[in-house]
């Protein structure tokens, strides 16, 4: 059976992050099951927090164990799903995006910070001239650029999920057309 693998790159250290990751991946797994011809392809989503061999924080895994395990999973993936939210992009997520870019693996990013854009309010632009008054969120432009060069950044969870489902539909068709 043909395989499609998605890699979910996200911060995973707080209860909030773990719940968000679990809920999004669970929703994706459910919706992917309803895609046309999905039963003809083995589709999986790797969520690093589910890999207890390296992410059970009460156990021990050193840096090379984590790097090797997650990199192997990432390199076997067809698409990387990257959560870009946070004060800055999580360092692990940024590293995963770099590996994906270097290997030509497409990335679908989610950057949902509500401080994006002016929402038509000119005072937000004027405030940029005042020290410590920026009304806008910050995202590392290098990391964002790597995603955009090899994928797309969405601004809300609905667009994120819809984009993933569309890409998985295309992958299903491509996999089923492959000659063995």
Label each region the model flagged:
Residues 1-180:
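Conserved catalytic or regulatory cores that recognize and/or transform ribose-phosphate-containing ligands
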